[in-house]
Amino acid sequence: MDINASRALANVYDLPDDFFPKIDDLVRDAKDALEPYWKSDSIKKHVLIATHFVDLIEDFWQTTQGMHEIAESLRAVIPPTTTPVPPGYLIQHEEAEEIPLGDLFKHQEERIVSFQPDYPITARIHAHLKAYAKINEESLDRARRLLWWHYNCLLWGEAQVTNYISRLRTWLSTPEKYRGRDAPTIEAITRPIQVAQGGRKTTTGTRKPRGLEPRRRKVKTTVVYGRRRSKSRERRAPTPQRAGSPLPRSSSSHHRSPSPRK
């Protein structure tokens, strides 16, 4: 990956959240893009990485949805006077990356106890589920951005996606009154290139290389009395002749008759 593509991939994380499709739509679109490569057993870089994220997102998404459903069902058995655990006592995604997976429950339980030692057991389970679901959602957000990048590179080409991210970020960073109303789309960027490639005529045979032979000078021609005469041809000087006079004689026949006086 060149430096421009690497920079564009890093900029994907700064794009607005609503720019990316929802998880269900994203996975469906990615599978449609990957299906031809799966059938041909392609081992391209973008195919392998996108396939990994499709499997990862599907598993994480189903697990996260299950956590939310269980947490919502526990609300009915939590005592109504229970104070919810403040967000500051819940483990965040950045902290979870530094904690071993087996110790995650222990660290979260210690924080709940520090907030309220006699916290109800149902409320504790609810707090654990909400914390884990949020960690999964933040992990899913990073994964879906990477999945979007890799399967769009398969659809449009890495160079086109890199160019599109650059233009989109420029549009987003430009004040509203100085930019166009609509954000650029990757379809609009790639369409002129596709039309130009499709409309190009193909020629058979080998082309003669230019510059190897001197160019021949074209001879200009003019039309004189219905005849075409080359300008490069030497012209004879016109013989002076008065109107109505006979044709001039040649120099050999130009001699005077003897004078009758002699």
Curated annotation (Swiss-Prot):
GO terms under biological process: microtubule-dependent intracellular transport of viral material towards nucleus; symbiont entry into host cell; viral penetration into host nucleus
InterPro entries documented for this protein: Hepatitis_core, Viral_capsid_core_dom_sf_HBV
Start and end residues of each stretch annotated as RNA binding: 254-260
UniProt modified residues of type Phosphoserine: S232, S245
A Pfam family of this chain: Hepatitis_core
Residue spans of biased composition, Basic residues class: 215-234, 252-262
Classification via SUPFAM superfamilies: Hepatitis B viral capsid (hbcag)
Listed GO CC annotations: host cell; host cell cytoplasm; T=4 icosahedral viral capsid
GO MF annotation, one: DNA binding
Key words of the record: Capsid protein, Cytoplasmic inwards viral transport, DNA-binding, Host cytoplasm, Host-virus interaction, Microtubular inwards viral transport, Phosphoprotein, RNA-binding, T=4 icosahedral capsid protein, Viral penetration into host nucleus, Virion, Virus entry into host cell
Highest taxon of source: Viruses
Disordered: annotated segments: 183-262
Residue span of motif Bipartite nuclear localization signal: 215-233
Similarity comment text for this entry: Belongs to the avihepadnavirus core antigen family.
Functional description taken from the UniProt entry: Self assembles to form an icosahedral capsid. Most capsid appear to be large particles with an icosahedral symmetry of T=4 and consist of 240 copies of capsid protein, though a fraction forms smaller T=3 particles consisting of 180 capsid proteins. Entering capsid are transported along microtubules to the nucleus. Phosphorylation of the capsid is thought to induce exposure of nuclear localization signal in the C-terminal portion of the capsid protein that allows binding to the nuclear pore complex via the importin (karyopherin-) alpha and beta.
Self-association state and partner proteins as the record states: Homodimerizes, then multimerizes.
Protein name (record): Capsid protein
